[in-house]
Amino acid sequence: MNNATFNYTNVNPISHIRGSAIITICVSFTVILTVFGYIAKIFINKKNCTNNVIGLRERIKCSGCEPFCNKRDDISSPRAGVDIPSFILPGLNLSESTPN
């Protein structure tokens, strides 16, 4: 009744190391691209602080383009949350909703 034991002597260590290296390279590449994309986004936003994308509300220019910018009309409360384009949720108006 020794059928449940596994024999790992036939595992090729070269293929195991190669597979681990490929996974490590892929994860590292993804992390590096994410970091460079974030840095590039910061530099692009410093040059053009207003997002003039069709369907989205224009944002005011902020000093340093911090992520919590104020709305154009309301300068009392900081921005929080994510802008939802109008073409994704056409029947939902989140900015004007008030609790009952």
From Swiss-Prot:
- Tell me the GO BP annotations in alphabetical order: proton transmembrane transport
> Which superkingdom is the protein from?
Viruses
List the InterPro entries hit by this protein, alphabetically. InfluenzaB_glycoprotein_NB
Q: Which residues lie on this side of the membrane: Virion surface?
A: 1-18
Keyword list (alphabetical) reads: Glycoprotein, Hydrogen ion transport, Ion channel, Ion transport, Membrane, Signal-anchor, Transmembrane, Transmembrane helix, Transport, Viral ion channel, Virion
How does it sit in the bilayer? Single-pass type III membrane protein
User: What molecular function terms (GO) are annotated for this protein?
Assistant: channel activity
Q: Which GO terms describe its cellular component?
A: host cell membrane; membrane; virion membrane
Keyword Ion transport assigned: yes
Q: Which residues lie on this side of the membrane: Intravirion?
A: 41-100
Per UniProt, subcellular location reads as: Virion membrane
Pfam families assigned to the protein according to its UniProt record, in alphabetical order: NB
Q: Does the keyword Membrane apply?
A: yes
Q: Where are the transmembrane segments?
A: 19-40
Coiled coil region boundaries: none
- Attached carbohydrates are found at N3, N7
- Family label: Belongs to the influenza viruses type B glycoprotein NB family.
Function (record text):
Putative viral proton channel. May play a role in virus entry.
Q: What is this protein called?
A: Glycoprotein NB
The organism encoding this protein is: Influenza B virus (strain B/Hong Kong/8/1973)
